[in-house]
Amino acid sequence: MKYNLNQLFKNYKINGLSTNSQTVKENEVFFALKGQNVDGNDFINDALNNGAVLVITENKKNTVIDKVIYVEDVYEALYEAIEIFYPKKPKNLISVTGTNGKSSVVSYIAQTYFLLRKKAAFIGTIGLEIFGCNNIINDVPSLTTLDYLNFRKIAHNLAEDSIEYLAFEASSHGLEQGRLGKTKVNIVSFTSFSQDHLDYHHTKENYLLAKLKLFTDHLLPSGIAILNSDIEEIEFVKDYLRNNNVKFITVGKKGDVQITKITCSLTGQNIDFIFNNIIYNLHTLIIGSFQASNLLIAALTLYYTGFKFDEIIEALSKVKPVKGRMERIDGTNIFVDYSHTPDALEKALIELQNIKPHGGKLSVIFGCGGDRDKTKRGLMGKIAAKFADNVIITDDNPRFEDPKLIRTEIIRGIGTATYTEIESREEAIKYGINNLKQDDILLIAGKGHENYQIVGDKKLPFDDSEVVRKYLFSMSCTRNQQKHLVSSRTVV
């Protein structure tokens, strides 16, 4: 029997939709989706016990249960229901993909819109952030790319609060798994491409093709793609987009928007570039020459949504660094960065080597995540040994792997170079700080914005930036106490 969902839903008191039997709320409709690892049909009774008013499934065996409705395609039914319950979305949708740089770009985009007096928001690895609205949206899942239902719930709520611009990250996993559903966006961009997630995609070609689904499956015909011209595979990407009739523009040293000079320091950078035959200069507090293309991708995004370029550049110069992205801790020479891929780690280390004071040394603290791409561990060890003066290997998010074995795989890549191995990440950070001398720089890499450490199935509170701040504060207190003791002893 074919159901008219709109008519069917009128017969029930329905408060919302859910695809999770554990979090489904009373009077919500539960859609029993069959995923790669979990089948929602196995949890229909759980959903009903938790208060689901209806269950939609494409498994006929389950329809003997009261309140269970059979449909031929449960995903199509979900999409139809989403249009009924969460039809609204911000007028301008912008999506960003790439191995590294996604979080930075979506943040820069939303910040710049707000600086130009527009309400904007971004969704991604860091979470949801809203500019120009006091409403707080709770229960945002911690995924780079949300599933389609949660994305549309949030987009609907943002539109209800008059948010006009929404920028969001699109991961290769999310694209491959169809989490964007039928989402169509105005602008897409490609920040970078290098090895990552081979545990999932198996080959770099599969990984690249997964990312390109954003451009072929989710960009409106009237939309435009913005590409980093410095991507090694850029010619393949451009040919692929041409063959799929996707309009694009490139940014970079050889881009349509050409970066001609970057001058970096510990306090920011100046970027000279040419756009439409006009020479521009952008001064920013954002550290890292690799951020130049990210900033200009953000600039072009606003340009193609109708803003004047001069106004964009003026506003863009005021954007703030993103937490855990080359984050300089309280004016010290200690940096926290999310660089968890070989390419990102190499770029971060090269950048800091180039801007460190004369005579200073560069130390790096990092580990690798468990149950993730194992092939990058030795590569990252090799990169650290090549570009850092001191290497400290510690734990990242070991998950269900033996952390000692993860560290051993990293150390194999280091070869004959010297290193220090410290299991506890907190102790490794303290060790790195204790061994800093004047003009030295310390990079704490891999976790960035994360405020947890995953050990087994537990998320333990842990924040690199806060560990640094607390330890620096304790050192300051100790020094003050020592000064007080010395001064009190000299009083006659």
Curated annotation (Swiss-Prot):
Q: Which reaction is catalysed here?
A: UDP-N-acetyl-alpha-D-muramoyl-L-alanyl-D-glutamate + meso-2,6-diaminopimelate + ATP = UDP-N-acetyl-alpha-D-muramoyl-L-alanyl-gamma-D-glutamyl-meso-2,6-diaminopimelate + ADP + phosphate + H(+)
Free-text description of this protein's post-translational modifications in UniProt = Carboxylation is probably crucial for Mg(2+) binding and, consequently, for the gamma-phosphate positioning of ATP.
Subcellular localization is given as: Cytoplasm
The record's Gene Ontology biological-process terms are: cell division; cell wall organization; peptidoglycan biosynthetic process; regulation of cell shape
Instruction: Give the cofactors, semicolon-separated.
Output: Mg(2+)
Name the pathway.
Cell wall biogenesis; peptidoglycan biosynthesis
Q: What is its EC number?
A: 6.3.2.13
Q: Which domain of life is it from?
A: Bacteria
**From the record, which residues define motif Meso-diaminopimelate recognition motif?**
396-399
Protein residues bound to meso-2,6-diaminopimelate: 372, 396-399, 446, 450
Q: Which InterPro entries match?
A: Mur-like_cat_sf (IPR036565), Mur_ligase_C (IPR004101), Mur_ligase_C_dom_sf (IPR036615), Mur_ligase_cen (IPR013221), Mur_ligase_N (IPR000713), MurE/MurF_N (IPR035911), UDP-N-AcMur-Glu-dNH2Pim_ligase (IPR005761)
Query: Where along the chain is UDP-N-acetyl-alpha-D-muramoyl-L-alanyl-D-glutamate bound?
Result: 21, 144-145, 171, 177, 179
Residues modified to N6-carboxylysine: 211
Provide any one GO MF term from the record: UDP-N-acetylmuramoylalanyl-D-glutamate-2,6-diaminopimelate ligase activity
Q: Which GO terms describe its cellular component?
A: cytoplasm
Enzyme class of the recorded protein, top EC level: ligase
Residues binding ATP are 98-104
Does the keyword Cytoplasm belong to this entry? Answer: yes
Keyword terms: ATP-binding, Cell cycle, Cell division, Cell shape, Cell wall biogenesis/degradation, Cytoplasm, Ligase, Magnesium, Nucleotide-binding, Peptidoglycan synthesis
Give the family from UniProt.
Answer: Belongs to the MurCDEF family. MurE subfamily.
Per its database record, what is this protein's job?
Catalyzes the addition of meso-diaminopimelic acid to the nucleotide precursor UDP-N-acetylmuramoyl-L-alanyl-D-glutamate (UMAG) in the biosynthesis of bacterial cell-wall peptidoglycan.
Q: What protein name is recorded for this chain?
A: UDP-N-acetylmuramoyl-L-alanyl-D-glutamate--2,6-diaminopimelate ligase
Q: Which organism is it from?
A: Rickettsia typhi (strain ATCC VR-144 / Wilmington)
Upper classification of the source organism reads: Bacteria, Pseudomonadati, Pseudomonadota, Alphaproteobacteria, Rickettsiales
